[in-house]
């Protein structure tokens, strides 16, 4: 037989002849297993035929090649390694040590002519080889240790002699390997005899089953025959199509259950069926509101009506949804579906150019946008329709600030199950994102079986909506949960960034799907409400199992954008399993493992191949890309014709690009991805898209490569980074090399690399932007001339994170160590979040320059929180160094919580409390009545005598006893609501009663009584005849008339020292939640808030800030004086609605716009060169507490704002004025807990406590209309407030959709109604001017 094509390659090993002369040895061979190590054997006989007769000396050569091919199929590698034992007749002289071989296969492109360059048998040797035979390489491609033994037998026919395994001598059995464990040992012993070849395999049963080994031997036999045929017939050596019948039966048994038929249903129809089953069940529980199934159905129908009336809808077209996480996202989705369209999520965090491409690809007819993204939506091209919340708490669509009434009746198109439901855009190879489409029927088919695998324990599913809108899981969170009758729990974007654990607990979520990277950020002990955690999007690690499997039910989910929901799922809590194995197929799929290069060839058990999915839940394909759709979605596979013989139906198949294999236990093990697609922190990235944009920005580059690497100092290997490699003329080296060579960092290249990274930010999402760009002198290539990505990754991974960053960041100074307690916490958290060694992080480094991204910042926030330090993601990413971040914390920013916890045991009120308890007032007979005592602080003191009344309309029957019980529970739950305010030696003390009295009255009024006016009169009487503050003022009243039993009024009277506008909505919602027999969860109370605020006040240096700000001032800007008598004085209120056409300038809040406009009006109206006024702020923003819900209590503070006129040269435009005020506001936030009286006495030269104007920007939670049960609703009716003190004037601004409501409450002793209207009009005009012309000269 002529095997000449392989001859020259073998001769690289030995110059004196062919391998045929050295690959055969006679004699007995001892066993390879160390003493006492268990092993099992399996045998196979390859019978003698014409091949063996033709060229017996070449048989050993063919066996070596066949074993290499078998290993390549088993591992999926083109480079495989094994030990060949023994080699010559002088075997004993070699000390029984094997030759180590590396076979480099190019067999996927093999032909007889290419074979000489497609293999290289001479690239490795063991240490026992004679000199000149080559050196062992630095990296061993063997995925498990294995040895091939070939022996010529001269025994009787059919007897190959004693084929026991040889001794391995001192071969290092624990040598590190590429992916598999080193002790996964196999020994293949081939005895060439007269009747054929007897193959004996010794293997470790701990890692291999007999069935797996049997399949391996069958592969070896088939490969051997194919190699012999190739040499004999002078034909190409192909990919060896075909499988033995036994092997095929084993594979088919893995898919014995066929997928179900495709469901003929539409998503919105199934949702409406859910609504009919349980209309009052809670569907959405979001940070901005709650919706029942009936409300969600009604609101989406209203919005659908608006869509129909706004544009001419093209049937089965697309509409974009550009909204932050909100209760209104599912309203928008369902509205789009109800008008017969499909939707595509537009993630507002992605670059504008990418969103424009998505809109163009989908030919979006309309973009449904929130007010937050209105400006961005208007630049995308399609018409924009705003979806937002109106004052009454219902949803409405709004276009061009016009709000026509919405009707639920509209022409409904006949949607079909085969219609597209949604499109999801992922990274694409052409430089632009590719859109995968899924139809209604596919989603409905998977939704039932898929969600059935996500049960909780004895409670209704409450699914936490974590995934960004750009990813498929977010659609499963919304629609999948709704179709199952569960509740979608929607956090705010800010909560996700800074306190995800708090958001989960605040919403009482019990299910979440997230990436393993995100799961590593959370602490299971901080999320006790979670019962089921699904990890998806990337490979799990053992640490993920160790962390979560004992705390929750842990599932691993596998799926892709090209199919609905997931296709494989694995239980990780009940049965111990490897992290990346899947034992269960979801009922909508069958899985097949095929050759990476030939989808028509099935792989045997244990062999590595590409995963193919088959089933009714596959998507429709790629939008506007028939070529790629045809490539990835296979209509027919020859290898499955036998599998489907007699089957009633078969489906298309999808080539996933994921490399997998069957484990010995029969599970599917996920090994990685083939080609240029990678997974990084749950994001699927096509590297060629990044390379496309790099080429555009690096025109001088001759070669550009992007890949994922693991820095050498990544301790646990869980923090891979994306790196780019560019070869430019200035650093290139001619010719091809087997090694990668990188240039040194230079300032010129660093500047160019920074510019390129900045340019990438404008075109691709942040998760696709490389952390570094490395100038590469030479790229490594394989023997076949291909780019060797594996070697490139390995060479780059030899660099540390700091080495990689030197190419894109300025030269690093000395590593400065942490000194203070706060610095040590920040330093250690940064080290842990980035997964680097401690000496790599210095306090002068910035977090982004260390390679930190937003996910790592979240991890750092979580770590700091466990150590008592509160930080925000934005702070971590914004600060120029860890030192400046620590200084901010030490100055009272995020570090306030950590510092105060250090003295948590020292109660700042202990002295005052002891003094009060030792001198109890007579109306408090004993201390047992008292739960707590502490001094009233700041703005709360001025509100201790104010009595406010709130009035609500109730429609429907009310159970008065249940309402009375609910009032009692509410009062007991919130500490502030069981407090009285007692004068004590010139100050007020807040006394918390253990069991307060319940003042609940039910009034039956004469028919015809105007209940609202009656309630207002009661409130006015309470305001005029204020009860003493030491009396318990909380009172609840239910009033009704005999003639209208289903209509009543509910009144609630509170002291303004017990609440503020920031918690009023919570008080109302908690009351009716208790009425519906729901359990209240109160994690933080007002006593904790008061103590924490005082601790910050005493620990932080506040006085210097206020002294500097108020230096030279003599007091608040005084109110004007009209001169009327006290008898004629009255309070007037004027207000105006300001329509807003432009958003605030970048970086400026709307509150700052109002603040700046009011300071300008004061300057213009009074002519004062210095204006000083008070502003009411929400103290909850600066006092960290555990509860994500607003603490019930008077947490507001009143602080001065000071502006000097005329403005300096650098501040003569509105933009500059607003920037200065924004900086003043941000700087003052950490100092707002200082008591106002103390501030005036110790930080100013003011002679008296003057009154003046108080500005309040009332961006507080809205009191929404509530639906209680099936037939009771609660609506806001009126209020009677007791706010102003003599000499005060209140200026308020309340944000509305597209507008501001501004008002002025002032005494006629300061101005008459005409003057008040002039002032408020001036404020409105100034706000518009500042927004429309921020760069005009003042």
Curated annotation (Swiss-Prot):
Induction (free text): Expression is regulated by the secondary metabolite regulator cclA.
EC number: 6.3.2.-
Domain Carrier residue range list: 820-893
GO cellular component: cytoplasm
GO MF annotation terms: ligase activity; phosphopantetheine binding
CDD domains xrefs: A_NRPS_SidN3_like (cd05918)
Disruption outcome: Impairs the production of deacetyl astellolides A and B and leads to the accumulation of trihydroxy confertifolin.
SUPFAM superfamilies linked: Acetyl-CoA synthetase-like, ACP-like, CoA-dependent acyltransferases
Presence of keyword Ligase: yes
Region (Adenylation): 271-681
Stretches for region Condensation: 949-1336
Example GO biological process: amino acid activation for nonribosomal peptide biosynthetic process
Highest taxon of source: Eukaryota
Swiss-Prot/TrEMBL catalytic activity: 7beta,14,16-trihydroxyconfertifolin + benzoate + H(+) = dideacetyl astellolide A + H2O; 7beta,14,16-trihydroxyconfertifolin + 4-hydroxybenzoate + H(+) = dideacetyl astellolide B + H2O
Pathway: Secondary metabolite biosynthesis; terpenoid biosynthesis
Function: Nonribosomal peptide synthetase; part of the gene cluster that mediates the biosynthesis of astellolides, drimane-type sesquiterpene esters that show antimicrobial, anti-inflammatory, and anti-tumor activities. The first step in astellolide biosynthesis is performed by the sesquiterpene cyclase astC that catalyzes the formation of drimanyl pyrophosphate from farnesyl pyrophosphate. Drimanyl pyrophosphate is then dephosphorylated by the sesquiterpene phosphatase astI to produce drimanyl monophosphate which is further dephosphorylated to drim-8-ene-11-ol by atsK.
Note on domains (UniProt): NRP synthetases are composed of discrete domains (adenylation (A), thiolation (T) or peptidyl carrier protein (PCP) and condensation (C) domains) which when grouped together are referred to as a single module. Each module is responsible for the recognition (via the A domain) and incorporation of a single amino acid into the growing peptide product. Thus, an NRP synthetase is generally composed of one or more modules and can terminate in a thioesterase domain (TE) that releases the newly synthesized peptide from the enzyme.
Protein name as catalogued: Nonribosomal peptide synthetase astA
